[in-house]
Structures are given as C-alpha cells and as structure tokens.
C-alpha cells in the first residue's frame, strides 16, 4: 500500500450540488486539507492558484460546464479609491481596526448572528451556532488574524481600543498579500457601507506591510452577491492562462508569471 506523508496534500472532488450564486446551475469543488507543518506554505501556493480557505480546508470550484467563479486580487500599491469609496472612508473616519489573534468572542458572535439573520437568513451558514463560529475562527493551521472594527472612543488614542464592535474580518496573512476569508458587520449600520470599508482598509494595510495583493475570493459576473468584487481596480483575475490584469479603464492584459 502506498504511504502518503502528512505534508503531502491529497485532493478530493465533491458531488454536484445546487449553486448558491447562479440559479439553475450546479457546483462541484476540489478540496484538500491544510494540516501539518507545511500548511502555511501550501495555503500560499493554493491561494495563488485560485483556492480559498475555509477552516482547515482549501477549495476551489471544479464545475463541469461553468467557469463563472473568477479568483481576484487587488493590486494594493496601485489602487486609487473612487469618489464613492473616498466618501465611505470619510464616513468611517471614527472607526479603528484592531488586529488581534484569531480568538472568537461572544461579542463577535453577537454581531455575526445579527448579520446572518438580516443578510443571509436562508444561506448555508444561517444555522451556525456559537461553537460553529468558534471553529470557523480557530480551526486554522496558517497565519490567521481577526481584525475588529470599533467606533473610536475618547481614550482610543492612548489605549488603542475602541468602543462598540461594528464589524469583523477574518484574514489570512500570505507571503504576497492579505486574504479576506470572511467578514461581517452590524446590520444596523448599513449607512456606513462597512463591507466596502473593510476591503479599503485591507488594501491600506497591505500597502503598509509591503504586500502586493489583497485576495477577495471569487468574482462572479452577474451575481448580486459577488459582482461587487470587480469594482476594486486595478486588479488581477485568474484565467486558465494565468493572472490577467484589469485596469481602472477596464482594459486587460496578461501579467508576467512569478
């Protein structure tokens, strides 16, 4: 019998299931487990190839007749916020982001639960319990952090701590960028456009860290849930031939491969 090292990834294919993004279609995924001493290196490599992480699993679409899911990453150092995005930054000037270890809290879960109940009541995560949430945050063998976004308080300049929790981002730190694994926000703060604000904040953080990219996951043209990811330009989109650059003008060009 062939023996496989714990650090050698084994890939599996899921059975077809209804697509959550495009009505009338079915999805399949190829996945592997991110475990062992080289989990971080493997996560970097697979993310470069269009995979996403969910807990200790890396996956990517492997649908039979559809290629609508396109992995995208923002070119952080060249990004320039649009007029609308600058307004969102100004609207959230009273918000600070606190980088923390990937440790779940009851306060986070309260916001998470409110977000699901308002935004994704019938989605696949709708029934997640506090233990499920804890697993989502803690079950990681890679460099994962939590960013808590809080309203700035009178002592924030001294303590670095904000007041009430507004939003949370679960983020992986890769060798070439930040990967936004999952984010959520207080639904009663819709006017702040906190989802957009968190992406803009990640772009700024990547710049400060000297990291070239922010990985947003899958852009799906025509999907109300995923189409927004195409607004952050310039960005690169993964095609069969490699990463293709899309400029603010909408023009595209094949990027040199690393």
Swiss-Prot record:
Q: Name one GO cellular component term.
A: cytoplasm
- Tell me which InterPro entries the record gives: Acyl_CoA_acyltransferase, Asp_Glu_LeuTrfase, N-end_Aminoacyl_Trfase, N-end_Aminoacyl_Trfase_C, N-end_Aminoacyl_Trfase_N
Q: Which UniProt keywords apply?
A: Acyltransferase, Cytoplasm, Transferase
**What biological-process terms (Gene Ontology) are attached?**
ubiquitin-dependent protein catabolic process via the N-end rule pathway
| Enzyme Commission number | 2.3.2.29
- Pfam families, alphabetically? ATE_C, ATE_N
Cite a single GO MF annotation.
Answer: arginyl-tRNA--protein transferase activity
Primary location recorded for the protein, binned into one broad class: cytoplasm
| Reaction(s) catalysed (UniProt annotation) | N-terminal L-glutamyl-[protein] + L-leucyl-tRNA(Leu) = N-terminal L-leucyl-L-glutamyl-[protein] + tRNA(Leu) + H(+); N-terminal L-aspartyl-[protein] + L-leucyl-tRNA(Leu) = N-terminal L-leucyl-L-aspartyl-[protein] + tRNA(Leu) + H(+)
Is Cytoplasm set as a keyword in this record?
A: yes
Q: Which domain of life is it from?
A: Bacteria
What job does this protein perform? Answer: Functions in the N-end rule pathway of protein degradation where it conjugates Leu from its aminoacyl-tRNA to the N-termini of proteins containing an N-terminal aspartate or glutamate.
Q: Which family does it belong to?
A: Belongs to the R-transferase family. Bpt subfamily.
UniProt protein name: Aspartate/glutamate leucyltransferase
């Amino acid at each position: 019998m062939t023996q496989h090292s714990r650090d050698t990834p084994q890939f599996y294919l899921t059975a077809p299931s209804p697509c959550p993004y495009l009505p009338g279609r079915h999805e399949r995924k190829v996945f592997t487990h991110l475990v062992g001493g080289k989990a971080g290196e493997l996560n970097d490599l697979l993310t470069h190839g269009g995979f996403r992480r969910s807990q200790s699993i890396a996956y990517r679409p492997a649908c039979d007749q559809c290629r609508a899911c396109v992995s995208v990453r923002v070119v952080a150092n060249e990004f320039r916020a649009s007029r609308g995005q600058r307004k969102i930054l100004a609207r959230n000037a009273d918000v600070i982001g606190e980088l923390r270890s990937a440790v779940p809290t009851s306060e986070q879960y309260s916001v998470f639960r409110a977000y699901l109940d308002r935004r994704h009541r019938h989605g696949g995560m709708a029934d997640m319990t506090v233990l499920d949430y804890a697993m989502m945050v803690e079950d990681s063998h890679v460099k994962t952090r939590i960013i808590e976004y809080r309203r700035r308080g009178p002592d924030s300049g001294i303590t670095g701590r904000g007041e009430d929790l507004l939003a949370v981002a679960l983020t992986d730190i890769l060798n070439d960028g930040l990967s936004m694994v999952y984010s959520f926000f207080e639904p009663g703060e819709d006017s702040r456009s906190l989802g957009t604000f968190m992406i803009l904040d990640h772009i700024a953080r990547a710049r400060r860290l000297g990291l070239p990219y922010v990985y947003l996951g899958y852009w799906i043209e025509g999907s109300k849930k995923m189409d927004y990811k195409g607004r952050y330009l310039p960005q690169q989109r993964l095609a069969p031939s490699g990463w293709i650059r899309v400029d603010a003008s909408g023009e595209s060009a094949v990027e040199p491969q690393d």
